[in-house]
């Protein structure tokens, strides 16, 4: 069924077809189904809540003029809009809660400018392309997502938080997004530019605050990297190594700590890891190789070259770890949390307490990052295995960790505030009122509550467990 015949029930579809052409407006179920999935199925709660997501059409603008016209048309008809990049999000950021349109931003792509310390790109530009353009000038992105091969610029800053480079340069909020331009969702869209601290108003806001048209990101001098496995018999020693690595003069783009049995779930590299061992995934400057090895050995670690022919190291840390654990344990779940910052001894105490309380259940996966003032931050993305009653057990686990001083970031909600990343959203809500006066931009994701309305979990046995990179060609 074409968009034209579908428009008998939704007359506005004819206008989108007239604007973009029939091939750029999808409304047939099979064609739009891939736009109605992301990686929110990592959470059994969200998997259930978002199982029946539907949309009237997917529209695919190819440039800023077409994007602006699409937004204006949607505003005129008061049609709900959900912006979508590559669909690599984990919280249902780009899945619509109301009928309307999904706007596929990937066609609005291209590098706009590269200068010393900054790069500007259109919203649908793939992060890998941005990194390559930067490297062509002897620079690299300060931070990029582990899904950089497929993730878009606007998708990353709207739905992500940190990633590769955060070990050296911090997360998105660490002055790594320099400026953003967006258009308002009005019948005559206006352009608004945000710079400096004002950029924080749109970071990790799930595309609820304006439609992004330009992203400017921080660049730093390029490095040559080597990727290695550092194997440990003792996870606390692994944690001490990771902390000291990031706190040292060694330049690391990644320091990802994986407690056993997580390494055994990472099938492309398990043959290099003795059973029961813990692993640090390290992506560090080749010039610092000797110092990195000496540090690893001082904590009892064994450094191994990355297995030849194996999947690249960047497809194992951050939320990729949850993909591997869900493949190994299909009924597992996950959390996100932050351990003690700037206090190594307290961090180790928290690691020990969680291991003793939840052995084999709370599998500790910790990304060691930093902040602008060089404070070490320990971000947990743990798989949760064997929770008998998922929601009840999850609540108890969260309560225990909170009592230890571990700050919980809850990935089991599609509402910005309930995720825990952005804190007070008063200014964001005020900006949304200005840029989205009709409230049609990704409705239900900001200023709402999911936890109060959630229902019982029904686990699906039909999941597409391919990695984000494998889905990009569809």
Model segments located where?
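N-terminal flexible segment immediately upstream of the FAD-binding catalytic core
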Residues: 1-72, 88-117, 260-270, 308-331, ...
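Buried hydrophobic positions in well-ordered alpha/beta secondary-structure cores of metabolic enzymes
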Residues: 16, 63, 74, 87, ...
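Short amphipathic alpha-helices in soluble, non-transmembrane regions
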Residues: 12-16, 74, 241-247, 288-301, ...
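Short cationic amphipathic helices and targeting signals
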Residues: 56-61, 119, 226-231, 274-288, ...
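FAD-binding subdomain of flavoenzyme oxidoreductases
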Residues: 110-112, 123, 127-128, 132-256, ...
């Amino acid at each position: 069924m074409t968009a034209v015949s579908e428009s008998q029930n939704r007359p506005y579809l004819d206008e989108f077809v007239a604007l973009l052409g029939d091939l750029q407006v999808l409304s047939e179920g099979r064609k739009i189904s891939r736009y109605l999935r992301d990686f929110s199925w990592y959470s059994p709660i969200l998997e259930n809540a978002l199982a029946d997501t539907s949309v009237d059409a997917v529209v695919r603008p190819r440039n800023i003029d077409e994007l602006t016209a699409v937004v204006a048309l949607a505003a005129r008809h008061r049609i709900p809009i959900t912006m979508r990049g590559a669909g690599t999000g984990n919280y249902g950021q780009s899945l619509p809660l109301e009928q309307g349109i999904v706007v596929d931003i990937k066609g609005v792509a291209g590098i706009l400018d590269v200068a010393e310390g900054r790069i500007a790109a259109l919203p649908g530009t793939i992060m890998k392309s941005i990194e390559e353009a930067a490297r062509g000038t002897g620079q690299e992105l300060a931070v990029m997502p582990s899904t950089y091969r497929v993730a878009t610029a606007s998708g990353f800053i709207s739905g992500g938080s940190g990633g590769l480079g955060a070990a050296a340069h911090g997360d998105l909020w660490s002055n790594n997004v320099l400026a953003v331009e967006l258009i308002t969702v009005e019948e005559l869209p206006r352009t608004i530019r945000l710079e400096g601290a004002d950029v924080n108003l749109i970071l990790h806001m799930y595309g609820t605050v304006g439609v992004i048209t330009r992203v400017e990101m921080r660049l730093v001098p390029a490095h040559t990297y080597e990727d290695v496995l550092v194997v440990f018999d003792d996870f606390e020693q692994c944690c001490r190594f990771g902390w000291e690595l990031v706190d040292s003069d060694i330049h690391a783009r990644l320091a990802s700590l994986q407690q056993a049995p997580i390494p055994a779930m990472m099938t492309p590299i398990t043959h290099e890891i003795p059973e029961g061992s813990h692993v640090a995934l390290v992506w560090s400057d080749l010039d610092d190789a000797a110092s990195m090895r000496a540090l690893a050995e001082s904590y009892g670690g064994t450094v191994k070259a990355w297995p030849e022919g194996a999947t690249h190291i960047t497809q194992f840390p951050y939320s990729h770890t949850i993909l591997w654990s869900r493949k190994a344990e299909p009924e597992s779940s996950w959390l996100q949390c932050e351990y003690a910052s700037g206090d190594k001894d307290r961090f180790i105490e928290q690691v020990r307490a969680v291991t003793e309380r939840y052995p084999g259940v709370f599998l500790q996966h910790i990304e060691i990052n930093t902040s602008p003032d060089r404070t070490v931050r320990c971000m947990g993305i743990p798989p949760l295995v064997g929770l008998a009653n998922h929601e009840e057990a999850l609540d108890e686990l969260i309560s225990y960790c909170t009592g230890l001083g571990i700050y919980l970031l809850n990935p089991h909600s599609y509402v910005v505030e309930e995720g825990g990343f952005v804190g007070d959203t008063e200014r964001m809500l005020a900006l949304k009122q200005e840029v989205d006066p009709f409230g049609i931009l990704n409705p239900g994701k900001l200023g709402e509550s999911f936890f109060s309305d959630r229902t019982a979990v029904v686990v699906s046995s039909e999941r597409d467990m391919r990695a984000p990179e494998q889905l990009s060609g569809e």
